[in-house]
């Protein structure tokens, strides 16, 4: 059985040894993995840590504002938000292949950190990498943005959670006193909404994806399912379908809903979701997002599918 207190003590000591009094930054996303890593690093080295949140433009609706409120205003972290939307979206123009998207995002992600590190005199990068990240990368299922680092990286990497699984990280979050909204927040992919937009990432599809995911989260979080599901989200498919808006034929985008249950993300299954809830989400998406004509439901387990679409 995983014991949190011994791990916390050993991890703090190990972080101190690895960092060796050097100035350090951490990639903070607001998810439970990076949040736990940030708290451990803060306890290990204190004011030598700078938490950096990169707004790639591919994050959830209102994400930057929430990150600032929680981590800066409530938790008092030394936080820097880097606005990098234009950089990421420009490089992703015309890119269709999902692995190419991930590699571009991974490269830019680290380049942004290197730039901040140089400006601030940082030398070490702490990451919230957990076991499924590197296991999947070594198995060549997917390349995770915090594993396939580009050549010539100038920062040393420290990964205090590398051997843990998500359920263990959540236990750590509770033991470290993180708020429930962080400790039990659903996982969000490192590349952000890029892996929930099939085909080319355009401003139109990105806006649809943000709003559709907001609607899904809002509806699920009104129910007990928020404590039972591993992930719940919407993806924008790279296809259009015919619909009717009023008395007029409409030809527009298709959104897929995905709900999965899992313990550690290595396997996952699709549980039964109340049909009236699915219908309510579908109705909201098609009525509140004008350029969506159809909503479909993905019921595929992992394996054979992965949890995210790309």
UniProtKB/Swiss-Prot annotation:
PROSITE patterns: GMPS_ATP_PPASE
Any one GO cellular component localisation term in the record: cytosol
UniProt cross-references to Gene3D superfamilies, sorted A to Z: 3.30.300.10, HUPs
CDD domains documented for this protein: GMP_synthase_C
Domain GMPS ATP-PPase: 2-185
Signal peptide: none
Record's protein name: GMP synthase [glutamine-hydrolyzing] subunit B
Gene source species: Methanococcus maripaludis (strain C7 / ATCC BAA-1331)
